[in-house]
Amino acid sequence: MATSTIQQSAFAGQTLLKPQNELVRKVGGNGGRVSMRRTIKSAPESIWYGPDRPKYLGPFSEQTPSYLTGEFPGDYGWDTAGLSADPETFAKNRELEVIHCRWAMLGALGCVFPELLAKNGVKFGEAVWFKAGSQIFQEGGLDYLGNPNLVHAQSILAIWACQVVLMGAVEGYRVGGGPLGEGLDQLYPGGAFDPLGLAEDPEAF
């Protein structure tokens, strides 16, 4: 009886361990990479979404327009100019704001990066971003990367032309579809740059 119980226990232990051993075997064959997914609450369940979300004046807010349903981030029920009344206009404005935020994040990186380079031996006329503009009034002026052979910042027209050409080319490339082809969301195309696999789960993304 004891022997039978021990054998059954051992068999049960092997059964319980089998999935784990199978997982270990598969992980070992895939270089130790495990794809894990978890369920994340959707945005409408948050207090910041839906009809009961906080309003811009709290309890003193006026009647919220019917087209502001709390579906999108930042919707506090305020649209006196009616900019979100037309769905197509709202979609276009939302696209522009997302792009503006991305340019702003890139600009924030551009504020910090020159200081990091300056601390590691790269010479700038002025690496601190809020002081760099004053260099335009100095005798030597302001050059990109401190190199006079590059675009000279004394010429406002040259700066303007560079901004229009460089940023306009990138934006035109994005609006035209870029390398991703058609049928993808222009704001969140996914797949182009996702080394951490953060967009693999549509619900989590």
UniProtKB/Swiss-Prot annotation:
Transit peptide: 1-36
Binding residues annotated for chlorophyll b 2, in chain numbering: R102, V151, L180
Cofactor mode of binding and number, as noted: Binds at least 14 chlorophylls (8 Chl-a and 6 Chl-b) and carotenoids such as lutein and neoxanthin.
Main location: plastid
Residues annotated for chlorophyll a 2 binding in this entry: H100
Binding, chlorophyll a 1: W78, S84, E97
Transmembrane annotation, as ranges: 98-117, 150-170
Membrane topology: Multi-pass membrane protein
Keyword match Transmembrane: yes
Modified residues (Phosphothreonine): T39
Keyword S-adenosyl-L-methionine listed: no
Keyword annotations of the record: Acetylation, Chlorophyll, Chloroplast, Chromophore, Magnesium, Membrane, Metal-binding, Phosphoprotein, Photosynthesis, Photosystem I, Photosystem II, Plastid, Thylakoid, Transit peptide, Transmembrane, Transmembrane helix
Residues annotated with N2-acetylarginine modification: R37
Binding, chlorophyll b 5: Q163
GO cellular component terms given for this protein: chloroplast thylakoid membrane; photosystem I; photosystem II
Single GO BP term: photosynthesis, light harvesting
Cellular compartment(s): Plastid, Chloroplast thylakoid membrane
SUPFAM superfamilies per UniProt: Chlorophyll a-b binding protein
Binding positions for chlorophyll b 3 per the UniProt entry: S155, E171
Post-translational modification as stated in the protein's UniProt record: Photoregulated by reversible phosphorylation of its threonine residues.
Function: The light-harvesting complex (LHC) functions as a light receptor, it captures and delivers excitation energy to photosystems with which it is closely associated.
PANTHER family referenced in this protein's UniProt entry, alphabetically: CHLOROPHYLL A/B BINDING PROTEIN
Quaternary data: The LHC complex consists of chlorophyll a-b binding proteins.
Protein name: Chlorophyll a-b binding protein, chloroplastic
Biological source species: Silene latifolia subsp. alba (White campion)
Source taxonomy: Eukaryota, Viridiplantae, Streptophyta, Embryophyta, Tracheophyta
